[in-house]
């Protein structure tokens, strides 16, 4: 535990307003007060991640640099809360502060790939193995049940006996117990949270069975599935036992025991009525739960500290209210006659120390449930459009089938469709940077949404104008990298059944395996063709990057790209489809997985299309959309 001495630094006049998604980091700034916990992290980004997953943390301060007398505080991550959502800022050189990402659905991810040269992340060393490089060391950690982080000593390390050795480590908190600078050492974290473990994924649920292994913690949960999710995101839980509300010992009813063992596997389950046991899903590659619980439990009362009371129409509205209230962790919606008025029934917003109810009782007239603040896509409620299923080899789409698709048209002597794009917000469209090669002038562009046929467009057809064009700063003409651009519209869109946004993926979706993917657009239906009048659609399989690279030996297919297409050809995006969406259905939602970018010809055999991988640009998208909105607010306030 790190203790921070209260020193009389200069206090800023600015308050920290915690409303909605706040991703900004404040340099040379420290939040005063509100201390919850202190840990060590290698950088501010990991500190922010830890704050996001802490049940009460709203703000954090990280010390990247400290005075010589305070070296024990360097790399200190101070997690904080505030009743008002604000804390005073003080100036401190080397400090970096920011907000939890609890309300930033697309940013929420436990995966952390960064490695840190020159740092020794210390913990309990439980395994030392010889490996040839840092990648092998990280893989070794990822495929070990107990490894949370590691340190690798290079061949230049000053102690010969440790050279090219990989030290696997863990701690009670899952974070380093201290961090020191050291030459020729490299540290990093396990990639289990990135769905890259090869351990395997036992998903068995054992009814009327209990594990008798070591308990690492316990929480109150309404069922075994919430228990399993909590186990999955706990740093030391490998399996669990949950006792139902019919368990004979009253004090253990609805108790979820989080467990571990030295071997990483549980002992054989013991037959026990009203007990349910199972495994953490941390090592799963495909089936990983989100760190949230969406089910609403009828006739159940979640007890906890009362945060606020309001009156609403329905348990789902109560859950939405809880989700939008950043400190709310769970809620009770009462249907008792004395708790109902004209405007609705009583919605009690609640919280606890660990984010779980302090007690669960049954038989009430009403419902209980959890905040959805840690659900990946909770901040895009309008993007949940359900649909019924450039395109070479495609078929005509139906009106409203792909409501996020837009046509980007240039108006010079005449008006022409040039590219596609995707609605991602009321004032934002995402497309390809190369669409603006030679035409980077916002005034000449028109954006049409909610249409099926290009021939429908007349002078009276509503269109949007560009207020701001944001092309990725690393994009270069005639290169395939960083082919992404944001369009800010002059006027916010009105959402209709024909014009709605597509869900954006989370950063954690980098390794998600998609099986139901489609491309859409008005582009050519053959290589030497012409723009189509009716929007085309085509289902298309994704191609692994390694296989795609073999087809394009003269180009580099990097992790910021994703490929799709049939081996035999015949279906692909083509000219006029650029900037349009590659969407995939995953966990019941359509997500924007790719942006049509480039390829060799159209629908050629063994020449898949190459798309910009959206999940790799989520930080950039959020940074640019938020900074633009902040600038607009500052301008309007001036």
From Swiss-Prot:
GO terms for molecular function: serine-type endopeptidase activity. GO terms for cellular component: extracellular space. Glycans are attached at residues 127, 215, 308, 396, 494. Its EC number is 3.4.21.34. Pfam families: PAN_1 (PF00024), Trypsin (PF00089). The enzyme cleaves Lys-Arg and Arg-Ser bonds. It activates, in a reciprocal reaction, factor XII after its binding to a negatively charged surface. It also releases bradykinin from HMW kininogen and may also play a role in the renin-angiotensin system by converting prorenin into renin. This is Plasma kallikrein. It comes from Mus musculus.
